[in-house]
Amino acid sequence: MTQLEMQGLAAKNASRVLSIAGTAKKNAALEAIASALEARREEILAANQEDMTAAKAAGMRPSLQDRLALDGSRIAGIVDGVRQVAALPDPIGEITKMSTRPNGLVIGKRRVPLGVIGIIYEARPNVTVDA
C-alpha cells in the first residue's frame, strides 16, 4: 500500500468518527488545527524554505514559486480561514425541501457529511483550507 493510499484510508476512518461528531467537537477539532498551525509556524516556515529551495533547483516557474511560498502573513491567513470555517453554521442534519406526495408520504432532504475528498496540488499550501 502506498503512502497516499494509507493516508486516504486513515482519512476515511477519521471521517466515520467526524460524521457522527457534534458541532462543538468539530469546532474544537478545527480550533486545534488552527492552534497547531500557529504553534508550529517556525517549523512550517522551515519546511517551506526547503520546498522553495527544491522548487528553484528544479526550475519551477516564478509564478508557481510565489504560490508555493509561505510567510507569516500567509500562515495567519490559513489560520484565519480555519477559524472562519469553525464560525460557520453546521448544516449537518438540517432537513430541507420537505414535500408530501399524493399518497401522503413525506419526503425531505437531510444534509449529511460528504465524506473524504482528496486534493492534489502542486504549489498552493493554502488550498486545502480554501477548499
Regions found by a protein language model. Name each.
Residues 1-107:
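N-terminal Rossmann-like NAD(P)+-binding subdomain of aldehyde/semialdehyde dehydrogenases
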Residues 91-131:
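Conserved small-residue-rich beta-alpha loop and adjacent elements
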